[in-house]
Amino acid sequence: MSSEQGNGSNPSTSPEVEGTKTIPFRRRLQRGQRVFAPKLMEALRRSRVSSEEAPVRHLSRRWRATTAQKVYSLKLYDALQRSRRSATVRDTADKVLATTARGATRWSRAILVSRFGTSLRRRRNTKPASALAAAIRGSGGSGRRRKLSAVGNRVRVLGGLVPGCRRTALPELLDETADYIAALEMQVRAMTALSKILSELQPSTNLGSAL
């Protein structure tokens, strides 16, 4: 990456070339594994040990596997190199996370089909709060009716926090929420480890500071 910066080329737009042949995506991933995979595995191992001290109730096991974190980290590293300047790290990280989930859940499919990740997060962060405030102001009737209304409002708030689950039945909503939380925890661990590795290998690059 340092040689590309010295030549004045943009690593996010120019393809990686070896001789006269463009290096395919699979080979770039393999090269990335050889460069920093050992350090990545060690960092992920340490983060996984520390995370195991916290309760793991209702968390999806697939996101706790070191292999999933390794695959996500390598895909994220390659995506950040190829991303446009207008794309934020958060948007790229969320899209790679949804791609890693392979569209097996509602939240991952919602992120993949969303054209505006920022507006999606804005709706996810602001509307639940306004809905909760309206529920508090408009609660009335008998005690049992107020209790049922409060439960329904909380379910709607929870559905607004998870992408693609605004109108999902409660049992499926709980499963989606558990999987989404586990995926976000894995994302934090992987991005933290990747940021440390990039800062050690290339302390002067903008990619490490952006994470």
From Swiss-Prot:
Disulfide bonds: none annotated. This is Transcription factor bHLH150. Residues 1-15 have a biased composition (Polar residues). Its main location: nucleus. GO terms for biological process: brassinosteroid mediated signaling pathway; regulation of DNA-templated transcription. Keywords: DNA-binding, Nucleus, Phosphoprotein, Transcription, Transcription regulation. It comes from the Eukaryota. It is found in: Nucleus. Atypical bHLH transcription factor probably unable to bind DNA. Negatively regulates brassinosteroid signaling. Homodimer. Interacts with PRE3 and ASK7. InterPro entries: bHLH_AtIBH1-like (IPR044549), bHLH_dom (IPR011598), HLH_DNA-bd_sf (IPR036638), IBH1-like (IPR044660). One of its GO terms (cellular component) is nucleus. Phosphorylated by ASK7. PANTHER family: TRANSCRIPTION FACTOR BHLH150, TRANSCRIPTION FACTOR IBH1-LIKE 1. GO terms for molecular function: DNA-binding transcription factor activity; protein dimerization activity; transcription cis-regulatory region binding. SUPFAM superfamilies: HLH, helix-loop-helix DNA-binding domain (SSF47459). Residues 135-184 form the bHLH domain. Residues 1-23 are annotated as: Disordered.
